[in-house]
Each structure stands twice: as structure tokens, then as C-alpha cells.
Amino acid sequence: MTYNLADLFESVADTVPEREAVVAGERRLSYAQLEERSNRLAHHLAAQGIAAGDHVGLMLSNGSEYLEGMLAAYKLRAVPINVNYRYVAGELRHLFDDADLAALVLHRRFAPSVAAVARELPRLRRFAVVEDGSAAPIELTGAYHYETALRSASPRREFPPRSGDDRYIVYTGGTTGLPKGVVWRHEDIFFAAMGGGDPVQMGNVIRRPEELPSRVLSQPLVALPAAPFMHAAAQWLAFHELFAGGTLVLTPQGAFDPEAIWALVERERVNLLVIVGDAMAVPLVEAFEARRERWNVSSLVAIASGGALFSPTAKARIAELLPGKLVIDGLGASETGQLGRKANTGAATQAPQFRVNDETAVLDEAMLRVEAGSGRVGRLARRGHVPIGYHKDPAKTAATFVEVRGERWALPGDMATVEADGSIRLLGRGSLSINTGGEKVFPEEVEAVLKAHPGIADVVVVGVPDPRWGERVVAVVKPCAPGAIDMECLRRHCAPQLASYKVPRDLVCVDELIRSPAGKADYRWAREIARRALLSSVA
């Protein structure tokens, strides 16, 4: 047995085969059934020519098929690749090509988007289509129905030996806004982000992979990850729970539905609800406030956020509405795994502050640890179990993963300081990226699209604090002439080229943008202009 993620899952499935692993709509799968379906998919992919090292894309909403796709790839020593189903043609084309996809598992409703770019990618000629109730046309050469493929494949666990050195890749936004693949070893991601065999996170990780079955909880934790599996934090939560013998309750496909989530919490006796910051917390709170007698959520122990931090306002509303429940902020990144967490049972009014272990530090410009209580600001960093680098991007790898005095550190780009008690206070991204509802938006990418509009002479894109989304994307524009651009024109221009969350929500027109002699935009000035304009619009 190794630290390969498939090996680890199989050991848990053999320990609690009849325990419920996944609840997804009407489908309820035990660990044995999830294992069998994953085996069938793996054998089918192998028959299609997928082998060790090949990349298999997953363009799916949350469902058992997403987990089956990941496990099937791991069983073959192949690599599952997360695909953001909100991407439009240009973004999909880049990701499919950059990730070297050899196969794609997708929900039927995404088939037209895939067909629009697949013909340009000769390597991608295998498509497993999961039915989702839509009638979207399937115009993909090499497409086949997912369930039909499973029925015709072997359920046996018959695969070559695997390794903890096998690859795990998760795609995230890059410095240009285009997605970049972060490459991990299985062993490293298991310890950095998936619990390390320590289900209650008390620092008692396993020393050998054979120990994992002994760490399976006698009473399973029931977790509901409302965040999509196409993001790292949701994947990590899912495998953390599976490696502990927990039960995953998955949300219905389609738009985010707060009432449906509360109904699932009640029906399935959910203990842990995991969401993405205020973008999900606010509508959940509003739905519960409107009908607080409707749902019995006494089983709920904690509400956690991954991908975006809760605002103090959201924490206060949750604490008032659900007294005694833990409200947990998670600290981490695709380049570091989980770094720490902060839990409250009441309102939090100060900046995010986290307890971390000795593998996490704040490093100054000389790459020395920032001393506790010094007040100095540095870059958040992690050593030990860190990624290999970025897929096909040696320059970014060298900039993000650095060796300091014989130790390799990951520097994800967050700025922080160390409090007198040793806790880390997070100050924000060192880059210009905007975090809106847990999604990263990079100004340069949006600006490039906007600058192509004939009515825009110059533009800077910034993030402005927003009570629901964390930040909202705002375009500060110098129009070519008065009235040359408005929000409707802007939306129409952006829609075919950008995912919806990247499209600016607000437009602020100015006579001139401030730039340096070298042409660099003054983002601080633009952000303040945008903030004032939005405040005056609601005054």
C-alpha cells in the first residue's frame, strides 16, 4: 500500500464497505458501491486508451460522477483535471490545450460549449457524457454515454501497482488570468490538504499508509459541500471526509438554492456545511431568517468557508441566527493546501487571524521569518508538503516555489503579519487579483477584453468591497466620447469572452485615468474612485 489516493480510498472502502459514502439526489452509494463504479469507469477509460500519466478532464456539477472520475483516474495512475464549467470558448480552449487533455467527462448541458472548441484539439477525442435531464445536442466525435460505459466494464479491482509519487493537479487562476495547473505528489496533497489521516485535525497524522483504516471514525461525520468540486477547497473537503469514513451529501444541480440546502441539512442530518464566503452565506441566512421555523438544523455543528473568508457581518448574522454553531474560516491556497483555520461561535470583528503549525510562516523580503509581535509585514509561506510546481510553467514555478537555506517554500501571494501570540493575521493578496464569491478575477484579463471595445479609450478593473460577494468587479473607464459606453453595452461585449463572474458589475466613467510614465495604472486611485462612485450612487 502507498500514499496514492486510490490506495488510501480502497483501504477505507474495505473497512466500511456498507457505510453510506455519497448522497446525491435519489442516488445513495455505499463505500463498496462507490468503489465498484470507480473501478468500472477506470476499466472503461483504460479500454479507451487512457494510461498512466494521461490527463482526464472533469466538466461536471457536483455529483457522484465527479468523485468516480477522480478515483478512476487515480486507479490508472492518470490525472483528473478540474474544468470550470462557467468558462466560455476562449477559456476552455486554453485550459484543454494547456492541460493536455486526452479525455473529458462532462454533463450533457456542457456539450455544446465543448463542441465549439474540441475540433481544434486533435488529442481530445474521448468524451463520457453524463445525462442531466437536458436535451443539449451531443456533437462530439468519440462521445459515449457514461452509464452505458459503466455497465459494460469490469467492476473488479485489477490495476497495476501505484505510487505516492503519482500526480494530483488542480487548475487555478494564473497571473494573466488564464488558468494554471498546480502539480502535487499524491503523498504531499494527502498531508497538506486532505487530513493526513487525522480526521479531527489534532496534529496526529498517520506515519504509514497502512494506518489509515484505524483512523476511520466509528460514527461518520455527515458533510454537505455546497461549493463546486471544480475548486480545490471542495475537492479537499470531499477526500478529507472519505478518508475518515464520512458521508458526503451533495446539492442538487443547477443554480445555488438556499432553501434546498437547508432542506438537505434537515433531511440528511448534516453536521458540517461547507460554503464559499458571503456569496453563499448571505442568501442562506436570508432564507433561514424568512422561514426560521421551517427547518430543524439541530444536527448542524459547524458552517465552514473555503475559497473566501466570511465577513464579520456574515459571521454576526450566522451567530445570531444559529447560536452555538461553529463558524469556521479556512486559510489555504491551491499552492499550499490547508494552512490553518479560525473558528468562532459568536461575531468576529477583527481581521482574519489564524493558528498555524511550524510548517507555515511569514517571510520578509530577506526570506527570514517575521518575528511575533514585530508588526512587520511579509509573505505567507509553507514548507514541507508543497507542490512540485506549475504545469508547463517553469518561470512561475521558480517564482512561487523557492529554496531558502536548504528548505523548499511555497509563496502563494498572500501578505500577513505575526501577532504577539504567534497567530498569523492575514492582510490580503499581494497581487491585484479580485476575489468575488470565491472566484479569482485578474484585472489584466478583463481589461484586455474591455480595451477592444470601440467606445473605451482606457480602462482599469478593480475590486471594491461588497457585503455579499466579498469583492465586486468594477470597471473604471475613460470613454472615447460621452455616452460611448454603458453597462448594457459592456455586458454584451464581455459575455462571449469572459465567464460571468469576471464581467464587471459596475461601470464608473472618468475623464482621465492616472498612469505612471511607464504606463502602469494606479490601481489604488482607481479603487478609491470606484468606491466613492458606488457610495454616492446609493446615497
Model feature map: region roles:
Residues 2, 18-63, 67, 71, ...:
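Conserved AMP-binding/adenylate-forming core of the ANL superfamily
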Residues 243-246, 270-275, 285-350, 355-361, ...:
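Gly/Ser/Thr-rich phosphate-binding loop
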